[in-house]
């Protein structure tokens, strides 16, 4: 994963979160999300894969900062941000007092900075189409400032991230690079939007 932005695609249960969590653990992040200094655990469910991964770093490119964002446990991360009294680094308002999407956009706007390693698991879970486009703009700025992103996503909009490498995990567990036009969420969304009735006809 040497590209500035690597997007992990694949069906539900294909292993994206397991992989991104293992990278996070190997990189020293809290398995439940947050920065490398977060050290809370509500329930240890991480796989042991992280202990078997060796991360290869470009010499002289140790991340200056970073964040592991997992949509499913951001509530607990928000509680930790409040407990540590560091809301100032997140836009000044506790994530608990913002909407789900607002709190994500606060995070990327205020806490993310140059030269960072950012591991994001389905950030689109909180975001509107506009929010996804705002995230793409912020990613472009941070990449220009030397940051690296690994993002698990089902979003055709995030898969359009310029210059990104898309790795798709197939049904057999194989990981293949694919183009934007080949990526499954793009193919399926295009087919659905071209003729919703064809898909929905089976429901009635
Ligand atoms: N704590 C766990 N213990 C055992 N198996 C697990 C655990 N968490 C997930 N799995 C299994 O590992 C497989 C991969 O799960 P994973 O969460 O990585 O998928 P995913 O690609 O992120 O899916 P989704 O798109 O639904 O988020 C699934 O079959 C899942 O049931
Ligand atoms: Mg997942």
What are these regions (language model features)?
Residues 78-98:
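Conserved P-loop NTPase mechanochemical-coupling segment
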Residues 3-6, 115-116:
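Pre-Walker A (Motif I) flank of P-loop NTPase domains
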Residues 9-10, 122:
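The Walker A (P-loop) glycine that initiates the GxxxxGKT/S ATP-binding motif of P-loop NTPases
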Residues 98-122, 130-142:
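GG-anchored amphipathic helix commonly corresponding to the ABC/SMC/Rad50 NBD signature/C-loop
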Residues 130-151, 155-204:
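C-terminal lobe/lid and adjacent interdomain/linker elements of RecA-like ASCE P-loop ATPase modules
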Residues 5-7, 17-83:
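ABC ATPase nucleotide-binding domain signature region
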Residues 13-14:
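ATP-binding Walker
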């Amino acid at each position: 994963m040497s590209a500035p932005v690597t997007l992990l695609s694949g069906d539900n249960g294909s292993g994206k979160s397991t992989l991104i969590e293992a990278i996070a653990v190997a990189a020293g992040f809290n398995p439940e999300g947050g920065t490398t200094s977060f050290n809370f655990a509500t329930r240890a469910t991480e796989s042991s894969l992280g202990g078997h991964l060796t991360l290869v770093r470009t010499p002289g490119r140790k991340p200056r900062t970073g964040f592991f964002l997992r949509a499913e446990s951001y509530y607990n991360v928000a509680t930790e941000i409040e407990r540590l009294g560091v809301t100032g680094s997140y836009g000044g308002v506790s994530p608990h007092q913002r909407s789900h999407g607002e709190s994500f956009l606060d995070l990327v706007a205020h806490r993310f900075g140059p030269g960072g390693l950012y591991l994001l698991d389905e950030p689109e879970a909180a975001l509107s189409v506009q929010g996804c486009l705002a995230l793409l703009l912020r990613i472009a700025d941070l990449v220009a400032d030397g940051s690296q992103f690994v993002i698990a996503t089902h979003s055709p909009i995030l898969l359009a991230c310029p210059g990104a490498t898309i790795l798709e995990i197939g049904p057999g567990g194989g990981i293949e690079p694919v183009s934007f036009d080949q990526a499954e969420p793009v193919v399926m969304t295009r087919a659905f939007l071209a003729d919703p009735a064809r898909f929905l006809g089976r429901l009635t």
